Amino acid sequence: MIKLIYFDFNFWRIDILRLCLSYSKIPYEYVRINRQQWPKKKKEFPFGQLPVMIVNDKQYSQTHSLAKFCATRASLYDTNELKILIIDQVLDWANEITTHIAPSIRAAMREKNLAKSKKLRQEFIENDLHLWFSYLENLLKNSSLNKKFFTDKFSIADIAAWRVIFWFCSGKLDLIDPSFLNQTPILKNYYN
C-alpha cells in the first residue's frame, strides 16, 4: 500500500498525488502532520520536506518524482517521449510559479510580516503572475489540438494545471484577483 504524508492542509503538491491515485481507484493511506509537530519530525524525512510517499517501507520525496510515480501507476502518464516532455513541463511550471509566489507566503506565515508579504505579493503580481500563466497558456496552445487536455488525453499534466489554477483563482491568495485569468482566454476556457 502507498502511504502519502503531508501537512494538515490542502495544497497542490499533495493533492495531485491523491487525485491521481483516487482517479484510478488505487488505495492509499494519507497521513497529515500538524504544523506544530513539523520541526520535530522534519529530520525523519528525505530532504526535510513534504510530501513524502512510503512504498514497501521505503520513503521517497520530491513532488515531481512522486507525481510521475503516481501518474504511472494510475495510467495518467504517457509512454510517448514527446508527450512526457509536455507533462513534465506542466509539472515543472507548477513548481516554478510556486517558487515565485513563495516569498510572499513565507513573509506572512513564518515571519508574520504582513507589510513585507504585501510588497512581495504586489511584485509577484506585477512581474510574474501574467507571465507564468501566459507560459502555461502557450504550452497548451502549442501542444494540444483539442485544447481540452495538454496531451490531447487526460493526464497528470491536467490535474496539476487545474489544481494550481484553482489555487490562484480561489481568492485565498491575498491581492490576487481571480479575473487575472481573463488575460489568458485559452487557459480560462481550459480551466472552466
Report the location of each language-model feature.
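Extended, charge-enriched "interface" segments that sit outside catalytic cores
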Residues: 139
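GST superfamily/GST-like fold recognition
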Residues: 87, 149-188
